[in-house]
Amino acid sequence: MRYLLLSSCLFILASCSSVYKNLQPATGDINYIQKFKPNFNNALYKAEIDVVGHHLSGLLLIKTLPDSTVRMVFSNEMGFKFFDFEFKQNGDFNALYVVKQMDKKPVIKTLKKDFELILLLRKDTQTSYLRKDGNSLYYIFPKQKGSFCYITDLGGSEMKTMEISSPHKPIVQAIMKNYTDGIPDTIGITHTNFNFTIGLKKIER
C-alpha cells in the first residue's frame, strides 16, 4: 500500500514522543552517542517522502565515498532523479541536483537538517551536554535555534529516538531501527508542525 511504509514509521515515532521538562543533569561521555552513527558504505532504501504537497516514492541510495563524503541520491524506479545531495566530512553541504518541484530553499534546508540528524553530523562537543529522566538519557547538541537531541535507554544500549527541537518543543522526530553491520533497516522522519515525512526501508542486495 502507498502509505504503509510511512504509516509504520510514524506509528513508532508517535510512541517515542519526548518530554523535555523535568530532566536532570547526567554524567557520561557525550561522544558515546557515536556508536549509533550509521555505517552507510553503500545502502539502498525503498523510500516514501511526503513534501510540499507531493508524495514521492522510489529508491534512496546512500553511499560513503573514499574521502568520507556521504552522497544521497533519490530517484524513482525508472531512474528519474529527485535530488542528489552530498555531505562533506568538514560539515559542508552541496545540493548537486534538485527536481524543480522541490527546488525551494526551505525544502532543501529542511532535508539537509533531517539527514544531518540521522547521519549524526553537526556535533559540537564543546557545547553539548547530557540529561536524563527515569527511563532515558538525552544527548543534547545545541544549535543556533534549538538543538539536536539523541535519546537512548539509561544503559546506552538502544537508540530510542532522535529529535530536532525549537527552544520550546520538538519539531522533528526520527527513528533508526534494526541495525545490521552498522546499517539500520528502518528509518523514519516526521515533522510535528507541518506535513513533511520520510520513510525508508532497506533493500537487501
Residue ranges of predicted features:
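C-terminal motif of bacterial Sec signal peptides marking the signal peptidase cleavage site
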Residues: 12-15
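Short, low-complexity, disordered segments immediately C-terminal to signal peptides
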Residues: 21-30
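Post-signal-peptide N-terminal segment of Sec-exported extracytoplasmic proteins
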Residues: 36-71
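Amphipathic hydrophobic-ligand
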Residues: 54-56, 77-83, 168-171, 194-197
